[in-house]
Amino acid sequence: MIGRLRGVLIEKQAPEVLIDVNGVGYELQMPLTSFYELPEVNQPTTVYTHFVVREDAQLLYGFITKQERSLFRLLIKANGVGPKLALTILSGMTASEFVGCVERDDIVTLVKLPGVGKKTAERLLVEMRDKLKSLMEASVGSEREFVLQSNYSPAPTVNSAEEDAISALISLGYKPPQASKAVSAAYKEGMDSETLIKAALKSML
């Protein structure tokens, strides 16, 4: 099982990245909360991973912190939640924000995420409350907090910022018209694609 990768970031196009580890390129999918923490291309990076084996594919999911990976693993154990939906949830809010939703029984915020209907949100609140309690009791220090410290610095602006942002939102489950509208409303001159994605997601929650 692959639990961690340390190498050079070769490509990043939300939500996918390619990391070179001793000449071997590993493709990963990452929630946007972790994606924002990545360094620039051609810089060294370390990510914690979760490896999924299916009949038709072998998939790697990457996370900047162990805490976020732990939450991802709890989410995919919940009834009706697979890796794709778990990735979408953690792209729409940080781990600490999700924990806050569970603690407050905040179903309104959860149903705004693509793929999360009222029944799914209600089930998540019930199932995750006990799972998170058990995890917190077993953790110590910073692992109890589920707080993601951000050192993200926006990359230089690119001409295709809006197109990249729309594509990223669609890949997370948003419908094309919804993604396009959110990106257009959030866009400000000089924005790079990653900042634009974050702003568009925030406007929809």
Curated annotation (Swiss-Prot):
State whether keyword DNA damage applies: yes
Q: List the GO terms this entry assigns under cellular component, sorted alphabetically.
A: cytoplasm; Holliday junction helicase complex; Holliday junction resolvase complex
Q: Biological process GO terms, please?
A: DNA recombination; DNA repair
Q: Does the record bear Protein biosynthesis in its keywords?
A: no
User: What family does this chain come from, according to its entry?
Assistant: Belongs to the RuvA family.
**The record's note on its domains:** Has three domains with a flexible linker between the domains II and III and assumes an 'L' shape. Domain III is highly mobile and contacts RuvB.
Major localization class: cytoplasm
**Protein name per UniProt:** Holliday junction branch migration complex subunit RuvA
Species of origin reads: Shewanella sp. (strain ANA-3)
Map out region (Domain I) in residue numbers: 1-64
Q: Which Gene3D superfamilies match?
A: 5' to 3' exonuclease, C-terminal subdomain, DNA helicase RuvA subunit, C-terminal domain, Nucleic acid-binding proteins
Q: Which gene encodes it?
A: ruvA
Region (Flexible linker) residue spans: 144-156
Keyword annotations: Cytoplasm, DNA damage, DNA recombination, DNA repair, DNA-binding
Q: Where does it localize?
A: Cytoplasm
- Relate the assembly described in the record: Homotetramer. Forms an RuvA(8)-RuvB(12)-Holliday junction (HJ) complex. HJ DNA is sandwiched between 2 RuvA tetramers; dsDNA enters through RuvA and exits via RuvB. An RuvB hexamer assembles on each DNA strand where it exits the tetramer. Each RuvB hexamer is contacted by two RuvA subunits (via domain III) on 2 adjacent RuvB subunits; this complex drives branch migration. In the full resolvosome a probable DNA-RuvA(4)-RuvB(12)-RuvC(2) complex forms which resolves the HJ.
Q: Provide the residue span(s) of the region labelled Domain III.
A: 157-205
